[in-house]
Amino acid sequence: MAGNKKRGGRNMDQVKKAAVRSDGVGGSATNAELPMANLVRLIKKVLPGKAKIGGAAKGLTHDCAVEFVGFVGDEASEKAKAEHRRTVAPEDYLGSFGDLGFDRYVDPMDAYIHGYREFERAGGNRRVAPPPPAAATPLTPGGPTFTDAELQFLRSVIPSRSDDEYSGSSPAIGGYGYGYGYGKNM
């Protein structure tokens, strides 16, 4: 049963078959695992709002995208190997786009790569430490202190005076105005 184990919604045998291209050369298994949800999200961004996408269309588009990524990736990998490098650089992909006839994609991709590198240099990909917890805020000098989160919670639970005036259900009406139910009769 190990061969029929599900992974990403596909049978593992199907993944292995998808990883072998039609010319018999083995592609990488990661190409066959291009996330369908991400692809469908991209498709929905370019279609009109109420357009529906059939299951067969999703599958065919996924297969085409996997084939395209593999095709361009193999060409970029060959460029890196020709220069005796094991790491495929973004410039290898740019060159493979040009060599394969996708010239109009080279300039936008180059601009994106340049912007991404600037973002990285500026430290944009580093996780920022969360801000320190809010300092306690004194309500009155010498009185109790509450954090901003506690104040927000209290404001959501305790009705404001304006709510009391309009609802007519406040125990403070006719009382001393403290809003805690202490009326004249108590």
UniProtKB/Swiss-Prot annotation:
Residues 1-24, 123-142 are annotated as: Disordered. It comes from the Eukaryota. InterPro entries: CBFA_NFYB_domain, Histone-fold, Transc_fact_NFYB/HAP3. SUPFAM superfamilies: Histone-fold. GO terms for molecular function: DNA-binding transcription activator activity, RNA polymerase II-specific; DNA-binding transcription factor activity, RNA polymerase II-specific; protein heterodimerization activity. Pfam families: CBFD_NFYB_HMF (PF00808). Keywords: Nucleus, Transcription, Transcription regulation. GO terms for biological process: regulation of transcription by RNA polymerase II. One of its GO terms (cellular component) is CCAAT-binding factor complex. Expressed in developing kernels. It is found in: Nucleus. Disulfide bonds: none annotated. Residues 61-72 are annotated as: Subunit association domain (SAD). Its main location: nucleus. Residues 34-40 bind DNA. Component of the NF-Y/HAP transcription factor complex. The NF-Y complex stimulates the transcription of various genes by recognizing and binding to a CCAAT motif in promoters. May act through association with MADS-box proteins. May regulate the expression of genes involved in flowering. Probably not a component of a NF-Y/HAP transcription factor complex. Shows impaired association with NF-YA/HAP2 and CAAT motif binding. Heterotrimeric transcription factor composed of three components, NF-YA, NF-YB and NF-YC. NF-YB and NF-YC must interact and dimerize for NF-YA association and DNA binding. Interacts with MADS18. Forms a ternary complex with the MADS6-MADS18 heterodimer. Belongs to the NFYB/HAP3 subunit family. This is Nuclear transcription factor Y subunit B-1. It comes from Oryza sativa subsp. japonica. The lineage of its organism: Eukaryota, Viridiplantae, Streptophyta, Embryophyta, Tracheophyta.
